[in-house]
Amino acid sequence: MEFKMTVKNGDFIRIEYTEMVDGQVIAATDKDVATEKGIFSEEAQYGPHLIVVGAGQLVKGYEEDLIGKEIGYSGKVEVAPEDAFGLRDPKKAEIIPINRFKEKKPVPGMRVGVENKVGTVTRVIGRKVNVDFNHPLAGRTIVYDYKIVENIDDQLEKLKALIKTFAHMELEAEIKDDVAIINVLWELSYYKEWLMIRRGLADMIIQHLGLKEVDYVEKHTGEKTRAELISPPGKEPLAEEAKPEEQNDGEAAPA
């Protein structure tokens, strides 16, 4: 009898998927699909995505659907708002004085940052800006058409896959005595993005590979190599940051 491997919590798997809302494709791992649907991005990583099952990289309903599926499985899952990006909360809609936005004039659809919250400008009336801090997909049912491509068993391959996924580059790495040793170009120290990525990457390695320590070793080659970093998947860049010194009068936006 042939043994068929099924997905369980803690597994490192690669998946391909297309994400849809109301029949419209909003994300895809296939470059050709993304291009055809007009959602291609130079900053996106295309090809099968690494998922550590149970790590919370996917919405709850999607991740739960993976459990028990065989490697090679293809199918669809429809995820209700409660198990996706949540229901829309009217209390998360606020009115912000327009003078809080110093760098760029707010317009409907703009993503903005206000006091460590990210929201979407929905309306600008006079000197007041309506900002919705709900997730853009809150209240929406999401459909995922996906395929489980492979399971990664080897520890070193898992480490390299985590590095590629979170650092968006391939770095030399090895595992010695329960310690992950990662060689990094010294130029990376100039990038604030890397300072944030390295902490999150180390946490993932220790938690999901069961290693005791992560050592980053600077590599000096004598060549001036400019390392290009991009935002990790799911990160929402702030189009405009509202200044905290000028406070709102507490008025709430209409639902």
What are these regions (language model features)?
Residues M1-A255:
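FKBP-type peptidyl-prolyl cis-trans isomerases
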